[in-house]
A protein has these predicted regions:
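Structural/interface elements that position substrates and couple domains in central-metabolism enzymes
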Residues: 2-458
Length: 458
């Protein structure tokens, strides 16, 4: 390997341009795999490391796992063919010969909403034994500010004196900012943040990322500031979604349509529009809010009460969807018990195959408690089981003889649903639109019993 941390910038530039820089990405999931492919596509020999042997085997066999990430399928084919990218489960075979080690590992939370950093800590313990002096570690995983400086570095360094951050290895962060479903587009246009424990490491990371992504690289004074920016952007969104969710519930009660309000409000130049919905899911926003809260309670448990309130609101929205459904059944005169309910969309967001922390799950759990028969149709989850339910493979068949439909995810396929068509297939014509994609007047005209978050009665 090359001792990149000891090189001057001309040597580093030559190393990058020649394609001799050796890169490994530990964790090749939703973000890690596209990241690794981007590095390989830039001409750098890249190895993806993951503990999932099936994923690794499929990748090495040419099976691309992220069908909902446009553009990366072609890149995947090309870098495999050019032998610029491969995958392995054997971290011990790759890390010692790598110049740059990227960490793209999950940071979920436990039942008590405490962030779990066990994957990062476990890998860092391995890095202590495997890292060759002169290399650079880059943390792309989203962590709370201070975690890298206060915990991760000491794990990698250990107590034997072999490794010392800023002396014989570099460590920095470049938090990912991509939106699942459009990762390539985001990687090609969104600025990236770079923070490190020392200026030279920060400059080397900037030079490497500039070669790979050709976007603006924004220097941060340290790792914790870069991580704070990443969390701030996502917590901001979580809080604003909570605000419009509460507005939606208020407006329902006084006959104002939240969608009409928001569409008009966004004509004001400094209004950043957010939309109400069945809840906020995925591996980012809910987790990031709790990461920030976890940090705050170490300082002062009274700080960030607005974030806490936002989480309470957003986590209450699945119950509000059930309340709207119950209203619909009352209007229909039919008992909700033993009724057949179709969930449209299981993913936490439109047009991706991902059910992490999706609001569909608590909605389904509540329906089961009401003794409803639940069906699920999601174009990204056919011929499979999720939440203990075998998914429907055909939308028309799924709709037939249902008593109610709940739109949970605004997949493109659902935007074109005609209310009259829904009415013609259903036994009891109750529609709950939690994403504001159905024209409520068209729904009423078609004879549907319509309820929507923030839509009011018509």
């Amino acid at each position: 390997m090359n001792k990149i941390i000891e090189m001057d910038f001309l040597e580093i530039s030559n190393l990058i341009q020649s394609g001799k820089l050796q890169v490994c990405v530990i964790g090749i999931g939703r973000i890690g795999l596209p990241t690794a492919l981007s590095f390989a596509n830039s001409g750098l020999h890249t190895v993806g490391i993951d503990i999932n042997p099936t994923l690794v085997s499929n990748i090495n066999s040419g099976i691309f796992p992220l069908k909902d990430e446009p553009g990366y399928d072609t890149i995947f084919e090309n870098v495999l063919k050019e032998k610029k990218f491969s995958a392995t489960t054997k971290i011990e075979d790759i890390v010692p010969s790598s110049d740059v080690i990227l960490l793209s590992l999950p940071t979920p939370m436990d039942q008590n909403n405490i962030p779990i950093y066990s994957a990062l800590k476990s890998v860092s313990q391995q890095l202590h034994d495997l890292l060759t002096p002169g290399s650079i570690v880059i943390v792309e995983s989203t962590v709370e500010p201070g975690f890298v400086e206060d915990e991760l570095i000491s794990i990698i360094e250990g107590s034997d004196g072999r490794l010392k951050a800023g002396k014989n290895f570099g460590i920095g962060v470049c938090p990912e900012t991509a939106n699942p479903g459009q990762i390539l587009n985001d990687f090609e246009r969104l600025p990236r943040l770079v923070g490190a424990t020392d200026d030279k490491t920060a400059n080397i990371i900037t030079k490497i990322y500039k070669h790979v992504f050709t976007v603006d690289l924004i220097p941060m004074p340290n790792c914790k500031t870069a991580n704070a920016v990443k969390l701030t952007t996502n917590v901001f969104r979580d809080i604003n979604i909570a605000f419009v969710n509460e507005l939606a519930i208020l407006f329902e009660k006084i006959g104002i349509d939240i969608i009409t309000v928001l569409e008009a409000a966004k004509t004001k130049y400094n209004f950043q529009v957010h939309y109400p919905g069945a809840g906020v899911g995925g591996p980012c926003l809910p987790v990031n809010s709790y990461q920030m809260l976890n940090l705050a309670k170490k300082i002062d448990k009274n700080l960030l009460s607005i974030v806490k309130a936002g989480r309470i609101v957003n986590e209450s929205m699945p119950q509000h969807v059930i309340n709207l459904l119950t209203e619909g059944f009352l209007e229909s005169g039919k008992n909700i018990i033993d009724s057949e309910i179709l969930i449209l969309g299981a993913s936490y967001k439109p047009d991706v195959k991902d059910i992490q922390l999706t609001p569909a799950e608590p909605i389904i759990d509540k329906l089961k408690m009401l003794k409803c028969k639940v069906k699920i149709y999601d174009p990204y989850f056919k011929f499979t089981d999720i939440f203990g339910i075998k998914t429907e493979n055909n939308l028309v068949d799924a709709l037939t003889n249902t008593d109610a439909v709940i739109i949970v995810t605004a997949h493109k396929e659902f935007h074109d649903l005609e209310p009259a068509f829904l009415k013609s297939r259903m036994r009891t014509p109750i529609l709950v639109d939690s994403r504001g994609i159905v024209d409520r007047y068209a729904a009423k005209k078609a004879g549907l019993i319509f309820r929507g978050i923030g839509r009011g009665k018509i």
